[in-house]
Design a protein with these regions (language model features):
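His/Asp/Glu-enriched short active-site or ligand-binding loop at hydrolase and phosphoryl-transfer sites
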Residues: 8-20, 184-185
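Active-site and substrate-binding clefts of carbohydrate-active enzymes
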Residues: 21-22, 26-328
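A conserved hydrophobic secondary-structure block that centers on an alpha-helix together
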Residues: 1-4
Length: 328
């Protein structure tokens, strides 16, 4: 499927590469290519843990800003009321006075200079570790190793307030210091080193325990039969009404495609598994499947309710250029 839609490469979890068939000669330090022609890079475990680990990862340093202490909740209600939600509900303002400080202890005030000093130290540590890692690997490999470091974008600046500055200092050090490596994208690496081992990656994901249990377990498995049924029906509609002109039916078909995609959003199943805003996630799945199903029968029976269609579009107007024919 990836190759069919022009995707040249993807990134898999560490075990997705280590358990590939046949076993990759260079482990996670060189890409592999599947029989279908899609190239896979694997997350590097060492560099990932240095940033992501909840125990000793960089973002958890005690000098960094505490994400969970916000004046929207900390300040006296009468003082903060003009700056929170118009209905009086406390919300995050983005203004946070405290640093992480430690575990299970009173929080100290955030000190910008301490945080910036820590960034400098950690960026240097990351650089030294990659330098040593690449030097070691190069002695065992006859091609340059690649250290693939994928991270969620929301880590930098959102969860880890100092994260963007850490990236800036790291890149600055790499540019000015004498390094035994260069920064490179997967696409650039493929262009420079096009020969690679043919192997099939093992199934993997970024979710807890590395497979699919976050999105398929006893708390959310009920949703899958409805999602599969809706997907089959979407394909049925596209086959029955191909290449509709600029008609009400086409608008309804496109809206069906929107509702299906929104119902399939992996966030709903993730939220249910994690136990946060569970009822909201259940309701979202039910609402999107419900709207899809109602439109499905209206289209099949040639009884499209224009007012209902407009109502649904006003609620869910994402993907304005969507074309239902992708399901043909």
């Amino acid at each position: 499927y990836l190759r069919e839609f022009g995707i040249e490469y993807t990134i898999v979890e560490t075990h997705g590469m280590l358990y590939a068939d046949p076993t990759p000669i260079y482990g996670t330090y060189a890409p592999i290519v599947s029989h279908e022609g899609v190239i896979a890079f694997a997350r590097d475990l060492e560099s990932s843990r240095q940033v992501w680990s909840s125990i000793n990862g960089y973002p958890g340093d005690y000098n960094y800003r505490e994400f969970y202490r916000d004046i929207g909740y900390d300040c006296d209600y009468d003082y903060i009321k003009p700056y929170i939600a118009c209905n009086g509900a406390r919300v995050n303002t983005g203004i946070k006075y405290y640093r992480i400080t430690g575990k299970d202890c009173p929080k100290d005030y955030y000190d910008v200079q301490w945080a910036m000093d820590t960034v400098e130290k950690q960026a240097g540590h990351f650089l030294d570790c990659r330098t040593a890692q690449i030097e070691h690997l190069s002695s065992y490999m006859d091609i340059p190793p690649i250290i693939t470091c994928p991270y969620d974008a929301e880590l930098y600046g959102h969860w880890w307030y100092e994260g963007p500055y850490w990236l800036y200092i790291l890149f600055k050090k790499i540019y000015y210091d004498k390094c035994n490596f260069e920064l490179i994208t997967p696409g650039e690496y493929i262009d420079k080193y096009p020969q690679m081992q043919v192997s099939t990656p093992c199934r993997s994901s970024w979710g807890a325990n590395g497979y699919s249990e976050v999105w398929l377990n006893q708390t959310n498995d009920y949703a899958h039969r409805h999602l599969h049924k809706a997907a089959d029906r979407m394909c049925e509609l596209a086959q029955k009404f191909p290449n509709e002109g600029d008609t009400l039916r086409r608008q309804a078909l496109n809206q069906c495609a929107r509702e299906l995609l929104m119902a399939q959003t992996s966030c709903w199943l993730f939220i249910i598994t994690n136990g946060t805003m569970v009822e909201y996630a259940h309701k979202s799945i039910k609402d999107h499947i419900g709207r899809f199903t109602k439109l499905y029968y209206q289209i099949k029976n040639d009884k499209i309710d224009a007012r209902y269609l407009l109502y649904v579009f006003d609620k869910d107007d994402i993907f304005p250029e969507i074309d239902y024919m992708i399901y043909y």
